[in-house]
Amino acid sequence: MAFLKKSLFLVLFLGLVSLSIGEEEKREEEEKNEEGANQEENAENKEKRFIGTLIPLALGALTKLFKG
């Protein structure tokens, strides 16, 4: 009976260890995905800021061209 009890505890312990390792890997993968999404958002924001500064400059140049 003691042999079965030890075997059961060993199986439960190994299952718990593998479960915790899987959860850790899943959490790391989610963090990597979030970082990638944040980098894409930053690139989009930079592009929007560039276009936002480019439009007034272009309008200013066009008004000078037509006035001039």
Curated annotation (Swiss-Prot):
Residues 23-45 are annotated as: Disordered. Its main location: secreted. One of its GO terms (biological process) is innate immune response. It comes from the Eukaryota. It is found in: Secreted. One of its GO terms (cellular component) is extracellular region. Expressed by the skin glands. Residues 26-42 have a biased composition (Acidic residues). The modification Lysine amide is found at K67. Keywords: Amidation, Amphibian defense peptide, Antibiotic, Antimicrobial, Cleavage on pair of basic residues, Cytolysis, Hemolysis, Immunity, Innate immunity, Secreted, Signal. This is Figainin 1.
